[in-house]
Amino acid sequence: MPEGPEIRRAADNLEAAIKGKPLTDVWFAFPQLKTYQSQLIGQHVTHVETRGKALLTHFSNDLTLYSHNQLYGVWRVVDTGEESQTTRVLRVKLQTADKTILLYSASDIEMLTPEQLTMHPFLQRVGPDVLDPNLTPEVVKERLLSPRFRNRQFAGLLLDQAFLAGLGNYLRVEILWQVGLTGNHKAKDLNAAQLDALAHALLDIPRFSYATRGQVDENKHHGALFRFKVFHRDGELCERCGGIIEKTTLSSRPFYWCPGCQH
């Protein structure tokens, strides 16, 4: 599943394609959304926001399209009039004079009014977004030590969108490798230096992944600077200590780590 950096890059691409341009055609696959097609003709996208792995497309008439790609959803940008070559099922089409954005295969799609947006169950439940520039390590540290999260093992906590939105499995293992911790630790057991390092890594690594334009594709992460230290590198040498990277399962997800330098 794409994680926060990949969702944010998708949002950037959508904004670059159609932001501020009048919509000339709108199509939704789901019957409950059909009524909005005519309401959106002539309107424009004001901005595309991410909340963790959810994407919010805001329109000039104050409606917002909520979509969560889950495992299979994908947005694509094409020139208007061009057919996208895919076997995926089209769910959403937003067309302007020169560019069209298409959402395929997703099933979690809703149109929300401003009032509904504030009350949406997922958006109410989700924690601060790791890519939000206003989120600081100090706030992250407060969340780590809060009664709600301080007794949770990191193996599960770092996958919980209620803790911090946008984290996922590759970020989980890379963050824990960076700070030299295993997944069975809890925030309440860390010393001050460990807490400080973890709070910074929880923001620095997702933001570094996003900023260096890496792409997750077929279990590889291709980017100018960001590269995996442990994710999908089981059996290889750890660049920090020379130990052998291992793979296990934690919180029902593959977990990659180095026994030599993660304790």
UniProtKB/Swiss-Prot annotation:
It catalyses: 2'-deoxyribonucleotide-(2'-deoxyribose 5'-phosphate)-2'-deoxyribonucleotide-DNA = a 3'-end 2'-deoxyribonucleotide-(2,3-dehydro-2,3-deoxyribose 5'-phosphate)-DNA + a 5'-end 5'-phospho-2'-deoxyribonucleoside-DNA + H(+). Its EC number is 3.2.2.-, 4.2.99.18. GO terms for biological process: base-excision repair. DNA binds at Q70, R125, N169. Its cofactor is Zn(2+). Involved in base excision repair of DNA damaged by oxidation or by mutagenic agents. Acts as a DNA glycosylase that recognizes and removes damaged bases. Has a preference for oxidized pyrimidines, such as thymine glycol, 5,6-dihydrouracil and 5,6-dihydrothymine. Has AP (apurinic/apyrimidinic) lyase activity and introduces nicks in the DNA strand. Cleaves the DNA backbone by beta-delta elimination to generate a single-strand break at the site of the removed base with both 3'- and 5'-phosphates. Belongs to the FPG family. This is Endonuclease 8. The lineage of its organism: Bacteria, Pseudomonadati, Pseudomonadota, Gammaproteobacteria, Enterobacterales.
